[in-house]
């Protein structure tokens, strides 16, 4: 029985440390070959009450065959984050590098779409940066959204920094 409890606790800790999963909330067709703009909702796993919506271009098989570059989608990503409930901040990374909140592949192997959270302590604001990461060549395409905490009733699980 004790092993089961320890295993359950370890699994819960592992799941809490993983980046969030996205939930598709919309898909808009943009042309006759099947290219779409996908809209997904992402709840911050360490900040309850904040939801980000990201959108990105999803290439169709026909487009990939016509234009080559079969294995990746464009780097363009848009993001909007808002308070969607009472905010409770868990054990977040307070460094200037921030913390990865979400990651998904947008190519066969190397290219990742990433959402990084940065806490702006001076302005009491959560900053969410959407960008792509590649092994060899980064992209300058990015989008940013902020959730101000100033004047809000925010519960800090480890005390306000």
Give the ranges of each region predicted by the language model.
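Bacterial N-terminal signal peptides that target proteins for export
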Residues: 1-8
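Hydrophobic alpha-helical targeting segments used for export or membrane insertion
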Residues: 10-14
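N-terminal signal peptide c-region/cleavage motif recognized by signal peptidases
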Residues: 17-19
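N-terminal secretory signal peptides
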Residues: 23-80
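Low-complexity intrinsically disordered segments
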Residues: 24, 87-161
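Generic structural motif
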Residues: 42-44, 57, 84-86, 133, ...
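Structured domain cores in non-transmembrane regions
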Residues: 57-109
């Amino acid at each position: 029985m004790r092993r089961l409890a320890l295993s359950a606790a370890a699994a819960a800790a592992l799941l809490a440390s993983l980046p969030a999963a996205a939930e598709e909330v919309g898909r808009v067709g943009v042309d006759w070959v099947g290219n779409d703009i996908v809209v997904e909702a992402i709840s911050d796993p360490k900040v309850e009450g904040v939801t980000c919506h990201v959108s990105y271009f999803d290439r169709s098989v026909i487009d990939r065959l016509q234009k080559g570059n079969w294995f990746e989608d464009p780097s363009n990503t848009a993001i909007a984050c808002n308070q969607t409930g009472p905010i409770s901040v868990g054990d977040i990374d307070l460094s200037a590098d921030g913390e990865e909140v979400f990651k998904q592949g947008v190519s066969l192997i190397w290219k990742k779409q990433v959402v990084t959270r940065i806490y702006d302590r001076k302005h009491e604001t959560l900053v969410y940066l959407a960008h792509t990461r590649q092994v060899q060549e980064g992209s300058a395409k990015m989008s940013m959204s902020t959730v101000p905490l100033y004047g809000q009733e925010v519960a800090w699980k480890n005390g306000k920094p």
